[in-house]
């Protein structure tokens, strides 16, 4: 059977995930990964806003940075009761989940997160979970796993048009398609190119 390439894989329905977050509210555990890091950060911001409507503070927000993850520090962050807000939020960045020592200890922690806490594992665009590992299997059974993929061409075209409009420019369809052909289909790569084109375009309309 032929292996699917990145363009053939199922695309994440980002608007649907935002609606789900709004309707269901924050879950206890999230695993965010995938190549589309711009959308990942946008989703993280929305999730954090739902958990901490008044913003980050030292009582209800904790951030742990990888590649190592100290179990006691993790437990302490999760067990800290939120202050002046309903939920606490623990952001864990770029931990080597595929290489954690004594993974069973972390499996126990991630499987027993209190109702008032949301833990979010945020992985780099290069991360790929090893589905053979017990820790990854456990995470997938208890976490809301979101893989942020490149978006469909139609969605990207609409997004490019909106980005140019925000900069006071309109853009021809052919110009938007050419931009994607040259810069690729990752939003983080398209944004600086859109900004440069909008800044140097002489007229109000960007053409191919």
Where are these regions (language model features)?
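Conserved beta/loop motifs at nucleotide-recognition and modification sites
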Residues: 1-208
